[in-house]
Amino acid sequence: MKKIFRWVALGAMAFTSVFTARADEGMWLPSLIENRIADMHEKGFRLSAEDIYSINQASLKDAVVLFGRGCTGELISPEGLLLTNHHCGYGQIQQHSSVEHDYLRDGFWAMSRSEELPNKGLTVSFLERMEDVTPIILKGYTSDMTEDERVALVKKNSAALIEEAVKDGNGLRAKVEALYYGNQYFLFLYREYSDIRLVGAPPSSIGKFGGDTDNWMWPRHTGDFSIFRIYADKDNNPAAYSLDNVPYKPKKYFHISAKGVQEGDFTFIYGFNCMAVCNLNPLDILPIISQKIAFKYISSICLDTNGEEVSN
C-alpha cells in the first residue's frame, strides 16, 4: 500500500509525493514548502526547500511552467524544449491540421527548427514569485462593510497592486488570487512568453487513446504528450513571434531518465492545478452527496438497464 501526500496551490502549483504506509493529504503553496520539508526528508526526499522554490537561485519552479491558461509544462532541454500533455496541445495541433496534413490523425514531427510551427495566442508563463499580500488587499476594510463594499475594495486594491508589480514590463503579468474563501490573498507574478512553436505530437490514436472516458474513469495506457519550444529575443526576454528569435535558455530544466522507478521510491509531481476543493465546508459537501452522487447512481442503473435490453 502506498502513502500519498498531496500539495495543491489554488491557481498555482501542486506536488504529489508517494511513499509506503497509509494515505495522508494536505494543501501547501510552493513558497511555504519549508513547513513540510523535514517530513519530506524523513520519507526520502533529498532536495532542499530552496531547490523547490526560490527567488534567489534557480529552482524547480523555473522548470515548471503554466502552458496556456490551464495546463502544466516542463522544460526538458537547454534549448527551450517543453513537454506537456497531448490534450493541452490538442487545439494547436488541430489548427495546423488540414485535409492534406491531418496532424491529429497522423501526428507531427518537425525535422528541423525551420519546420517548427508557430501558435498565435499561445503563451507560456514562468512563475517569478508569489507572496502573501493579504494586508495590502484588505487595507481599508472594516467589519461594518457590506459584502459588495468588501468586493469593491478588494478589486480596487488588487488592481493597484498588479499595476505596481508589472510596471517594469518585459513580459510581466500579475494576478491576485483569493485563498481559503477570501481569508488570504496571494500575488502571483509571471513572466510570459508568446513565441511558442509546435515541435512534435503523436497521432491521436496514441496521444488521446481511450478519449475522455478513459481520462476520467480508468487507469490510462496513453502516450499523452506533445512537445513545444519556447523562443525569445537574443537577450532571452519575451518577444512576439519573429524569425530572428532564438530558443529560450532556461534557468533550469529536467533531465529525462529512462531508468524508471522502484517500489517505494520517493516520487514527486509539481504543476499548475486546474482547481482544488480540498477545503470544502459541510454546506458545500451536502449538494455533492444529495445530488451529484445520486445522479451518478441513477445513471449507472440506467446504463445497466440499457445493457440488459440490448442483450435481450
Where are these regions (language model features)?
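Terminal presequence/propeptide segments associated with secretion/organelle targeting
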Residues: 2-5, 11, 19-312
